[in-house]
UniProtKB/Swiss-Prot annotation:
The gene is vapB28. Keywords: Toxin-antitoxin system. This is Antitoxin VapB28. Pfam families: PSK_trans_fac (PF07704). It comes from the Bacteria. Antitoxin component of a type II toxin-antitoxin (TA) system. Upon expression in M.smegmatis neutralizes the effect of cognate toxin VapC28. InterPro entries: VapB-like.
Length: 81
């Protein structure tokens, strides 16, 4: 599948990346797309993990929520207890 990018600023940016890295323009575009995709997937993972945390917290008893978890997990110097 061919891409036809008509934005001159994109062409210029790709040329600059290729010049700086020594990559071909196609490799520069592929790397940029893959890095963006990885960031998006990572953001999705973070959102899913936060959702799990919120769901878990909603199931905790009031007593468990009142506990000072830092005091249970760390000593006075902030090191694991």
């Amino acid at each position: 599948m061919a891409l036809n990018i008509k934005d001159p600023s994109v062409h210029q940016a790709v040329k600059q990346i290729a010049k700086i890295t020594g990559e071909s323009q196609a490799r520069a575009v592929a790397t940029a797309v893959n890095e963006r995709l990885a960031r998006l997937r990572s953001d999705d993972l973070a959102a899913r993990l936060l959702a799990i945390g919120h769901k878990t917290a909603s199931r905790m008893s009031p007593e468990a929520k009142r506990l000072d978890h830092d005091a249970l997990l760390y000593d006075e110097r902030g090191l694991p207890a």
